[in-house]
Amino acid sequence: MELNRLVTEGRLQESLEIDQVSTLEMVRIINEQDKQVALAVEKELPHIARAVDLIAERLRAGGRLFYVGAGTSGRLGILDASEIPPTYGAPPDLVQGVIAGGLEAVFRTREGAEDSREQGAADIAARVRPGDVVVGIAASGRTPYTVAALEEARRLGCATVAVTNNPDSALAAAADVAIAPVVGPEVIMGSTRMKAGTAQKMVLNMLSTGAMIRLGKVYSNLMVDMQASNEKLRHRAVRMVVQATGRDEDAAARALEEAGGSVKQAIVALLAGVDARTAREALDRAGGYVREAIRLAQGK
């Protein structure tokens, strides 16, 4: 698809005078456009849900999740991947981000890196194995590096998902599931770090959060596999046990200590009325799902 025919490369009529208006009007124009992003993402919810189920299925079977992209899209993938271990207690290699140009490109643009199909295919081939799932991210849907990476992932037996802002793109064609929120032209023509990037971030939030919920790393709306690696998070762990069980802070803190800091284990112990060891055994039998572990610990 020619660049000038892409939705994301169009010229927004509402911002033609943005260089002449007051600062308040300037940010109002940007804000008005941003309001459209969530609505565009809403239209893609069925596809997002399919992708969540696909990712969870692969992860449950021992696969891993890879995000791949260039520029802003690549950085968003790395950002999302980096938050998974501390938030959900996942192994650091469970969700990984791959960016055109390597890690240096996270901080400084590597001109031309996105144009190499060969490097895109090579970067993915060096990392993935059959059973993994690869999410290609590109506003245009035509970035050579990302398209080639997704095509190579599919060839190697990975499940593939496309996150793009231009439907009917080469990236979408290489995906088992295509997610394409159409946010329209940017306030600054072609600056896809704006609405397109915001839409991508929202989609990635749903993909990773949804997958972690399906893997049992959330109980109610609590991140019960969180790694309490600092004082703030240790206090949060106590609060989560209090909120999940209705016990006071002293009881929650004791249960956490007996559970070796495991929020899940403390919750199961308190709600099932069992000791920490029994709670751990129930969680192991339940595959880490708190509700099922409580049922098993109670002998139901």
UniProtKB/Swiss-Prot annotation:
Superkingdom, natural source: Bacteria
GO BP annotations listed: amino sugar catabolic process; N-acetylmuramic acid catabolic process; peptidoglycan turnover
EC number, UniProt record: 4.2.1.126
HAMAP family documented for this protein: MurQ
Subunit structure: Homodimer.
Family that this chain belongs to: Belongs to the GCKR-like family. MurNAc-6-P etherase subfamily.
Protein name: N-acetylmuramic acid 6-phosphate etherase
Record organism: Symbiobacterium thermophilum (strain DSM 24528 / JCM 14929 / IAM 14863 / T)
